[in-house]
Regions:
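Second-shell loop/turn segments in exported
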Residues: 4-7, 60-68, 257-261, 274-276
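Glycine- and aromatic-rich loop/turn segments at beta-sheet edges
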Residues: 1-5, 89-94, 252
């Protein structure tokens, strides 16, 4: 079946290999880091030893070290096959949020709010929607994530653009001039990992570039986070909100009728699994 192009809304070989690498990596590293403890068979205090059906348990490969090597080898082989195929086809992130119709598009941003993901090679599986069977992905991103805010500690976990952690740059509140502190959202986004600076919403940003479905009660321009409103659809519970999935066209923001696609699995995970 090699050479046949399958719709990536269905299970395919590359997806199966990715899942194989994920499971094998988990199993191998779990055995490796919990070796000798009660969390793995035959470890100190392992409760399975007291069960008649497990009293003489032996690993299929002979011992735990062989088992670890088996799973890690399988993870490496499966992830390498996918990684080699897609390493030159990952979606580019310009780091910029499109703010006007004549601004350059950011393919990475669009990958999470497009209606058809078949043009993104790294997306190995995605879910398609229609207006009759829709979602509220784009609408939630346009609002305050419907009362599910991210925490300050979550934001602080993102590295700086140069790969250094935030805590090496002065205080969390004030920074050192490279890390700008967190007095404002604009400061938080400055010189950060491009995924944070792209997806963390900032007051004053344009949320809707094309208003093809006017008359909706949308945030065309991102407001100051409203943390006291009682309407959970518009509530910003922490002051930090994400725009991932936030389509720039209002036609995708009709309640219960949005049809931006949902990314399920991406080939980039295979590269990460292989490196690990």
């Amino acid at each position: 079946m090699d050479g046949i192009d399958f719709a990536t809304t269905r299970i395919n070989r590359d997806l199966a290999l990715l899942l194989k690498s994920r499971v094998a990596l988990y199993e191998g590293t779990f055995l490796k880091y919990f070796k000798g403890t009660a969390f793995v068979p035959n470890g100190e205090g392992w409760p399975g030893k007291s069960k008649e059906y497990n009293a003489n348990y032996e690993y299929p490969s002979g011992n735990i070290d062989n088992e670890i090597n088996f799973f890690l080898d399988e993870a490496m082989a499966a992830s390498k096959e996918v990684a080699e195929k897609y390493k030159g086809q990952l979606t580019a992130n310009t780091g910029m949020l499109q703010q006007a119709a004549d601004d350059p598009e950011n393919p990475y941003y669009n990958m999470f709010c497009d209606e058809d993901l078949s043009s993104y090679p790294e997306v190995l599986l995605w879910r398609q929607y229609t207006m009759n069977k829709g979602n509220d992905i784009a609408l939630a991103a346009n609002m305050g994530n419907w009362g599910v805010g991210i925490t300050r500690s979550f934001v602080q976990n993102f590295l700086m653009a140069d790969g250094t952690p935030v805590y090496t740059h002065g205080t969390y509140a004030d920074g050192d001039g490279y890390y700008m502190g967190d007095q404002t959202i604009a400061d938080v986004r400055t010189n950060r990992d491009s995924r944070l600076s792209l997806f963390l919403k900032e007051p004053g940003q344009t949320n809707i570039v094309w208003d093809d479905q006017p008359g909706q009660s949308l945030n065309l321009i991102e407001p100051v986070p409203n943390i006291i409103v009682g309407d959970m659809q518009r509530a910003y519970t922490t002051g930090y909100a994400l725009r991932k999935g936030g389509a720039l066209n209002s036609k995708y923001c009709i309640q219960l009728k949005g049809y931006v696609a949902l990314v399920c699995y991406r080939a980039v995970e295979a590269l990460l699994n292989y490196m690990e």
